[in-house]
Curated annotation (Swiss-Prot):
The keyword Acyltransferase applies. Residues 34-48 have a biased composition (Basic residues). A motif (GHSXG lipase motif) lies at residues 322-326. Glycans are attached at residues 453, 461, 469, 594. It is found in: Endoplasmic reticulum membrane; Nucleus inner membrane. The chain crosses the membrane at residues 81-101. The lineage of its organism: Eukaryota, Fungi, Dikarya, Ascomycota, Saccharomycotina. This is Phospholipid:diacylglycerol acyltransferase. GO terms for cellular component: cytoplasm; endoplasmic reticulum; endoplasmic reticulum membrane; lipid droplet; nuclear inner membrane; perinuclear endoplasmic reticulum. Residues 1-71 are annotated as: Disordered. It is a single-pass type II membrane protein. Residues 54-70 have a biased composition (Basic and acidic residues). The gene is LRO1. Its EC number is 2.3.1.158. Its main location: endoplasmic reticulum.
Length: 661
């Protein structure tokens, strides 16, 4: 104790001497507490002296926050900000809660807190508060959180309850939902494996679409890859490893716990009377090439029989809903089901018109997506596969680009997403339809460009057609063969070619090469998001290290990725075929099927990680109030209540595109 006392006295003396140099004289204190207090004051003054030197460097910005005595001004005090934060933290919950008070108690609540007066006070304090809080106050005063807005409809069951109240709608048409690429859970059904990987440990565990997937890819990467990769030669299951798509609504409602996909749609359909006897989720193994889905799983046969059963039991035609790649699957199915031949549907012409009431194309990729090209060239996945951020981070973090490329190349379903229509849709080196959007000095038709060439192998820029050809040329022979057997990415030059292409399955995923079915009573709804920057073109470089991946996006470039209008994944121009169909009867739409186009503006809620009820992002659109509203109206037989809306110039672009017919 004596030692501590002497040390403190010495510190006091030192502090006193230093303070005397600055012109301040302090009396000695006898109390130990006062000695500590004096020590603290001396420490603060030393900091003040040091701060004075820094103040000369910082200049007016530092002095502006202090008054003439060197103290912080009251408006910049942390204590003031804390008090204001606490004040707002108490009053704002009352403000939001007032909107949800029962009608019988609303007057009492309004008398308790006068929100008009609160807004006046908030106006007085807005200039003092941080920018984030000020923006929050602006949203409140603008009425962005009123009950009449769609934000309130982001809650569970909200859209269904509102439509039930306003229109008294009820379930009518059976509903079949076809999910998009990678959004269906994949689970292991194998029990053998090999010497390095015992498959029985993963029996009936989801190796895609669960936290178990994340744990396995981190803890046992080699085993996880052996399960999810397909056999390169056959495109089917590798020996001793068996994965299958999860079934039922659980297969697509959530990707990972907390990250919903179709759950909002299920909830709202349930409100108006839908249940498993009236709707189903047609989950599929999206890794497989389309005809391999039929060859291995009889997927299209099961889908046909499910639709026929629904039609027989209910007496109503079926409503098909496809999201993303699911829309391609539905378009393919409508050609498959009426085609004749082995592994085909053999339903005969007229089957679609007899069994299908409507086709809802929600953010569909009927003409592909540019992101599929860098996925197959250089394994880009973080921004290519729009799903749970944690899952995509795991794929980017724990797998090299070479590993990702090899995995993606075995998945025969991925090439189906390659863009279709060549220069008609995607432009050439001279121009593209989207160029006027941003007044580009360059053109989006220049899809892949090389700013730094290290060899003669890649010494020119590439259009979309050239880029796809290059992608295949640097791919393994077995991938080239599978793509040529399963898909086609061009366009038909005349009506005769359109009809001829209906005979072979490789054309059925491309609406530029085959017409819509003869189904005059079917209705098509194309609903997609706009106003969200979307990848459209890329700058690539050739790596010097031959042992590494040969081609990668050149992130050292000033602009490695060129963005355009879209929904964050699918660019606007990829919906061109909907507008071509909507022009009326033509070789592409021989029956004159009625096509309704609804463009949804992406207006995400800044306080909702999934964007809220007004989001039109590629995946989050499934939770938007507007899309759910349309789905329920169409499924209940009230599709006439869906009003077309075009916010972009795509219809004008399509009229100027060089379609051959």
């Amino acid at each position: 104790m004596g030692t501590l006392f002497r040390r403190n006295v010495q510190n006091q003396k030192s502090d006193s001497d230093e303070n005397n140099k600055g012109g301040s004289v302090h009396n000695k204190r006898e109390s130990r507490n006062h000695i500590h207090h004096q020590q603290g004051l001396g420490h603060k003054r030393r900091r003040g002296i040091s701060g004075s030197a820094k103040r000369n460097e910082r200049g007016k910005d530092f002095d502006r926050k202090r008054d003439g005595n060197g103290r912080k001004r009251w408006r910049d005090s942390r204590r003031l900000i804390f008090i204001l934060g606490a004040f707002l933290g108490v009053l704002l919950p009352f403000s939001f809660g007032a909107y949800h008070v029962h009608n019988s108690d609303s007057d009492l609540f309004d008398n308790f807190v006068n929100f008009d007066s609160l807004k006046v006070y908030l106006d007085d304090w807005k200039d003092v508060l941080p920018q984030g809080i000020s923006s929050f106050i602006d949203d409140i005063q603008a009425g962005n959180y009123s009950t009449s807005s769609l934000d309130d409809l982001s809650e569970n069951f909200a859209v269904g309850k509102q439509l039930l109240r306003d229109y008294n709608i009820e379930a009518k048409h059976p509903v079949v939902m076809v999910p998009g690429v990678i959004s269906t859970g994949i689970e292991s059904w194998g029990v053998i494996g090999d010497d390095e990987c015992d498959s029985s440990a993963h029996f009936r565990k989801r190796l895609w679409g669960s936290f178990y997937m994340l744990r396995t890819m981190v803890m046992d990467k080699v085993c996880w890859l052996k399960h999810v990769m397909l056999d390169p030669e056959t495109g089917l299951d590798p020996p001793n490893f068996t994965l299958r798509a999860a079934q039922g609504f659980e297969s697509t409602d959530y990707f990972i716990a907390g990250y919903w996909i179709w759950n909002k749609v299920f909830q709202n359909l349930g409100v108006i009377g839908y249940e498993p006897n009236k709707m189903t989720s047609a989950a599929y193994d999206w890794r497989l090439a389309y005809l391999d889905l039929e060859r291995r799983d009889r997927y299209f046969t099961k889908l046909k029989e499910q639709i026929e059963l629904f039609h027989q039991l209910s007496g109503e035609k079926v409503c098909l809903i496809g999201h993303s790649m699911g829309s391609q699957i539905i378009f393919y199915f409508m050609k498959w089901v009426e085609a004749e031949g082995p592994l085909y549907g053999n339903g005969g012409r007229g089957w679609v018109n007899e069994h299908i009431d409507s086709f809802i194309n929600a953010a569909g990729t009927l003409l592909g997506a540019p992101k599929a090209v860098p996925a197959l060239i250089s394994g880009e996945m973080k921004d290519t596969i729009q799903l749970n951020t944690l899952a995509m981070y795991g794929l980017e973090k724990f797998f090299s680009r070479i590993e990702r490329v090899k995995m993606l190349q075995t998945w025969g379903g991925i090439p189906s997403m390659l863009p279709k229509g060549e220069e008609v849709i995607w432009g050439d080196m001279k121009s593209s339809s989207e160029d006027a959007l941003n007044n580009n000095t360059d053109t989006y038709g220049n899809f892949i460009r090389f700013e730094r060439n290290t060899s003669d192998a890649f010494n020119k820029n590439l259009t979309m057609k050239d880029a796809i050809n290059m992608t295949l040329s640097i791919s393994p022979e077995w991938l080239q063969r599978r793509v040529h057997e399963q898909y086609s990415f061009g366009y038909s030059k005349n009506e005769e070619e359109l009809r001829k292409n209906e005979l072979h399955h490789k054309h059925w995923s491309n609406p530029m090469e085959v017409p819509l079915p003869e189904a005059p009573h079917m209705k098509i709804y194309c609903i997609y998001g706009v106003n969200n920057p979307t990848e459209r073109a890329y700058v690539y470089k050739e790596e010097d290290d031959s042992s590494a991946l040969n081609l990668t996006i050149d992130y050292e470039s000033k602009q490695p990725v060129f963005l355009t209008e879209g929904d964050g994944t699918v660019p606007l121009v990829a919906h061109s075929m909907c507008h071509k169909w909507a022009q009326g009867a033509s070789p592409y739409n021989p029956a004159g099927i009625n096509v309704t186009i609804v463009e949804m503006k992406h207006q995400p809620d800044r306080f909702d990680i999934r964007g809220g009820a007004k989001s039109a992002e590629h995946v989050d659109i499934l939770g938007s109030a507007e899309l759910n509203d349309y789905i329920l109206k169409i499924a209940s037989g009230n599709g006439d209540l869906v009003e077309p809306r075009q916010l972009s110039n795509l219809s004008q672009w399509v009229s100027q595109m060089p379609f051959p017919m």
